[in-house]
From Swiss-Prot:
PANTHER family linked to this entry: BASIGIN RELATED (PTHR10075), BASIGIN, ISOFORM G (PTHR10075:SF104)
Topological region Extracellular: 18-232
Membrane-traversing stretches: 233-253
Name of the protein in its database record: Zwei Ig domain protein zig-1
Cellular location(s): Cell membrane
Length: 265
């Protein structure tokens, strides 16, 4: 009877303490440009896994659920049925994020979170070029506005964990004012003045730990803003009018000389 009670106590303790363990992986990325239609892919496959924290517990069925879109991924079990895995042959930045591993065991269900991390990358249809050959320092095409107009500067970055974004202007921290404000990670310049022209840089940073090593990842995106005079169109027009005037003067002068020469003859 005593032995039976001990066995019962052991089984109950095992079931109550049932938990899981799982993987933490990171995408290996060698570029920083991605878009919805052409997501950036990692250079290596990634296998996520999870298992009961009690090595004696076997798994009956298992699957992973991606938290971002609730997509269900059927897991494969190893021969001993003590580990569940799913392999992404060519993972993209859209696969980064949190996954819930759900295991069904003879002792009950286990739920555990696993993670795929991604450094910050640009995720946009905008055109970007590498700054001086640095793949994680990008430049966008410049924006030109007239004095008094408004301009909106976005920082279209993605990554997991979600990157922390800060802005600088001409390598100094961005100073907010009545004309320069922020909504989330977007900079809005209203009633632009000549002093608002310059290089606005979005700096996106995230940090994660894989296999005991903590990585802090940085992406810099430069956006140039040029503010021109609202009367700038007058200058080319003035040049054209002056040119026409000079041509008319030359033609009239030539005609006058021709007439004068003819009258002398």
């Amino acid at each position: 009877m005593k032995n039976l009670l001990l066995i019962t106590f052991f089984v109950v303790s095992t079931v109550t303490a049932l938990g899981g363990r799982g993987s933490k992986s990171a995408l290996v990325l060698v570029a920083a440009r991605s878009s919805e239609n052409h997501p950036l892919h990692a250079t290596d496959p990634i296998t996520i896994w999870c298992a009961p924290d009690n090595p004696q517990v076997v798994i009956k069925t298992a699957h992973f659920i991606r938290s971002s879109d609730n997509e269900k991924l059927e897991a494969a079990l190893n021969p001993t049925k003590k580990n569940a895995t799913y392999t992404f042959g060519s993972p993209s930045v859209k696969d980064a994020g949190e996954y819930k591993c759900e295991l069904d065991t003879p002792h009950g269900k286990i739920s555990h979170k696993v993670f795929i991390y991604s450094r910050p990358v640009v995720h946009s249809h905008e055109h970007f070029t590498e700054h001086e050959g640095h793949e994680f320092h990008l430049e966008s095409t410049g924006t030109t506005v007239e004095k008094g107009e408004s301009v909106t500067l976005t920082c279209p970055v993605t990554g997991y964990p979600k990157p922390v974004v800060k802005w600088t202007k001409d390598s100094a921290p961005l100073a907010l004012s009545q004309s320069v404000s922020m909504e989330g990670s977007t900079v809005i310049v209203t009633n632009a003045n000549y002093t608002d022209a310059g290089t606005y840089s979005c700096e996106a940073v995230n940090e994660y730990t894989v296999n005991g090593k903590t990585s802090k990842m940085l992406l810099v995106v430069d956006k140039m803003v040029d503010v021109r005079s609202e009367f700038q169109w007058v200058y080319p027009l003035a040049v054209i009018l002056i040119t026409i005037f000079l041509l008319v003067v030359i033609i009239v002068f030539c005609e006058w000389r021709n007439k004068k020469s003819t009258s002398k003859a």
